[in-house]
Amino acid sequence: TLGFFPEIIGTLPDYRGAEACNVAGTIITALKLAESGMGDYWDEAESWVRNHFVELQLLDTTWIQRLPMRHAIMGFPMPHRSVIDERYMCNDRVVDRIIGSFAPSACPNDWARHFLGITGCCTGNANRAWYHIWQNILYHDGGKLQVNLLLNRSSKWADVDSHIPYTGQVDVKIKEPVDLSIRMPQWVSSS
């Protein structure tokens, strides 16, 4: 599935956005449930990570630099210079400084359709999700190594190099002797 979880349903029919907070929280919940054995949600979590979550992170800012400069976003007027505290606000290299942040309300095909801005909660929660994703790619215990998510990961036991979605190949380079098991997603044929 895509991993698009709308933040508002019903009250604003033309508003179709998913906060990175929503997507991050849903991924973390799926990982925690799968990790604890309360359900097999590995496929869902990996699908949501690959499809919508990675696209929520701002890595390419060239499109922002091409936008016409605006002094205000509708509904968010710029404060008068007399109330700007330069200890907390600046307009110096803002685009360069927001690389790595997350979309506050993205649609499946638009990074910012309704609100062109950054919110601290989305960036914080999404980075917390990256931690849980990273931790759950591999699980090591007592000489046994389990690959749960077919995503790239380096560790002292093994490196996982995923070529998905470009090819159906995942390489695991073993660095220490381990009993290796790899969880096969439901979409992998048994033949």
Model-derived segments and their meaning:
Residues T1-S191:
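Glycan-recognition and catalytic cores of secretory/periplasmic carbohydrate-active enzymes
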